[in-house]
Amino acid sequence: MKKIEGGITAAKGFQAAGGAAGIKKQGVKDMALVYSEVPCVAAGTFTTNIVKAAPVKWDQEIVYNHPTAQAIVCNSGIANACTGEEGYGYCRKTAEAASAALSIPEDSVLVASTGVIGKQIPIDKIAAGVEMLKPQLAATREAAATAAQAIMTTDTEPKEVAVQIEIGGKTVTIGSMCKGSGMIHPNMCTMLSFVATDANISKEMLQKALSEVVPDTYNMVSVDGDTSTNDTVLLLANGLAGNPEITEENEDYKIFKEALFEVNKTQAMHIAGDGEGATALFEVTIQGAESKEQAVTLAKSVITSSLTKAAIFGHDANWGRILCAMGYSGAKFDPENVDLYFESAAGKLQIITKGVAVDYSEEEATKILSEPKVTATANIHMGEATATAWGCDLTYDYVKINADYRS
């Protein structure tokens, strides 16, 4: 597997565009269009929040009940959530606009939104935006970057990644763009992720691969513990790489799934590290668990602990907060068997052994915790299972960003 420069247009046959449709103020980019030159098989995973935004319902219908998809229209600034039948109707009108502009079936258009909940989409601006973006569609690196910028809300930077693999003597590319900074606690973040590949793979196996990698990538991210109404991961495959079609769990499927995992893991870490107001990516690994479920529960409990996140912001080795978060997670373990380490580019330091603090240097601990990526590793010595979750520190700016969000 090779990481390459690129984003959503890295794979053969995919084009993208981004621009300002007037949804946001002051001419900020707020709309993106992704298009495949040929129809794609599509897969998706979606929010588990009972309150589902209209685009989520639309996309579930397309992904689960239609054979192909060919375009994605995404706006930022308004979530189109809690908007009733009118909001769902606007998804249909968005698809109609894209269908007319691109000469593709209406039911091959996927729709996504992110932003303020409760406002109706300005459908005239969306329709005009599609017309504006259509002639700008391109397979260039610049087009991909512009599209990635257009789906941002409180993100501080666009999030893109691409990889290449060899399957059946053919080069297969997977590219992606995503957004997410606040309201990040998926259980499948607001999190939107769009992945495009030229792999030749059946719809069934594409969905299987996505469903298998999401639990250990996006579902292991938390910025603030809030699960969005709009969480969506969409994966399109157009087959233009020309590899033998993947129709079963063979070696080709394994290679593809590993690459898909790497793309989504990288994007999950991008989201966590760009949490609203964040100054550090906080990674938590649980080792020695009896089961994967136990390890996941413990890691997520630590990553969502506000007190622990605040300590990371303060570069404070307050290990008691980590042990406390593990203790109220609901997972059973013996606290007197826990070893805990802090690690970063500045070094690695054992903080507790068998549940008791060792004689460590607070100065060294502070140095380690002052890096932009910090890892806490807890070994509970009960088995062989492990899990890793990603979050960020909790800063003053998080409160300021969210207090001022609608203004």
Where are these regions (language model features)?
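A structural signal for small-residue-enriched, beta-sheet-centric alpha/beta enzyme cores
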Residues: M1-N75, A79-R92, S99-S407
